[in-house]
Amino acid sequence: MKTILVEFKTSLLITLVFAVLLCGAYPLAVWAGGQLFFRQKANGSLVMDPDGTVRGSALLAQNFSSDRYFHPRPSAAGTGFDASSSNATNLGPTSDKLANGIHAKDAAGRDVDDLNNFDGIKDLVKAYRAENGLGADESVPADAVTRSASGLDPDISVQNATLQAARVARARKLPVVQVEALVASHVQDRDLRIFGQPRVNVLLLNLALDQESAGR
């Protein structure tokens, strides 16, 4: 009986110690480290107006669809850009749905709105070329027509942003060189100069674009 009590006491003590460490000390240390060294990122990388109005997060894509703005990558998060439903298409490279999409038709063979409709890469390439005034044989950046693994990638490639500059400039009646210069000023280098590719944050670029237009 004494042996059982000793073992129970030891087990209880170990449980309490690890509960304090793993449920208290460790989370507190991680939180404190985040607040001390990565305060902006730890708090969601929120982007705010001078008056404190939150415009979004620099870590999450938003669905900019107007010609006056740069567009993010396509999204498969929920019905698109749903931060509560981060997701990829999970379609393989040989998938016919990924390449050609799915489009519901009516009795006359015309496209109709349907929850199961899905734009394939060929559809997205065609739409991208049309909205940006590109030729039928002009190369389209891969990130412009593919959905990211999270569906919420906030960045686009420099080539993607550059190809959209003429459309944005035309919609805002700004010189193309002015918009291209704004893109160039928002290019972020590779992480640690070796990981990933140079990129442009769409939300930050679009907010700077609004400020540029307002200052004319």
Positions of PLM-derived features:
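Non-catalytic, structured segments within soluble enzyme domains
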Residues: V168-R216
